Amino acid sequence: ADHGDMLGERGLWYKMSFHEWSARVPFIVSAPQRFQSGRVGTPVSLVDLLPTLLDLSGDPHLEAPADRLDGQSLVPLLQGEVASLDRPVISEYLGEGAVAPMVMVRWGRYKYIACPADPPLLFDLQEDPDELANLAGRPEMQDIEVQLDQVVRKHQDLNQLHEAVVASQQRRRLVFAAHMTGTHTPWDFQPVFDATNRYMRNHLDLNDVEGRARIEST
């Protein structure tokens, strides 16, 4: 899964936030012939899946990919060569319940949440696993907060992204209104079936019918 669920914690349901109940899910790998069993506490991401699979397969494209890979191979973690990865892990949310783009950065024990519509949140998950104490704005946490905020700014300009989303919504609303004017023509894909050639008929050979059911015509 790519997310968990809020089950009443903080009065919230579903996902729609970056609190641990929603954002944290286990990344499970089962390869008993290759790796010893164990648990690793370092944050990872779904974008690590592709480089990990490339690494496991021995694919040479991992060394010189055609395009930049966002993630990092987790094979060193799986093989016990390292205990953690010292790098930020980034998550984005622009879906239901968000009035502006939200970005979460996990780096070691710290979690930082940024959103143009809300004050920043900073949690020390080692000391505060329930995320009850927001450390953002505290003088003693200034260096950590600045470091994580720079990760967000380097990743994405949230104000610019918000403007782009609103502009896209306005264009799509205009197109939708135009399509709904006069005779409505749906864009939904509608496959057309010819029943005379779809099922077994006297004029059709069994092998031809079964072949068409399995192989796309060209």
Question: Where are these predicted regions, by residue range?
Answer:
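Metal-dependent active-site segment of extracytoplasmic phospho-/sulfohydrolases and closely related
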Residues: 1-11, 57-60
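Short catalytic/ligand-binding loop motif for oxyanion handling, primarily in non-cytosolic enzymes
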Residues: 5-9, 15-16, 99-101, 113, ...
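Substrate-binding rim/cap in mid-to-C-terminal beta-strand-loop elements of soluble/periplasmic
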Residues: 13-83
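Active-site beta-strand termini and strand-to-loop segments that position acidic
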Residues: 31, 105-108, 115, 125
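Non-transmembrane alpha-helical segments in soluble domains
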Residues: 50-54, 75, 79, 123, ...
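WW-domain-binding short linear motifs
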Residues: 87-91, 166
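Intrinsically disordered, low-complexity polar regions and short flexible loop motifs
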Residues: 128
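Long, internal low-complexity/basic segments
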Residues: 137-218
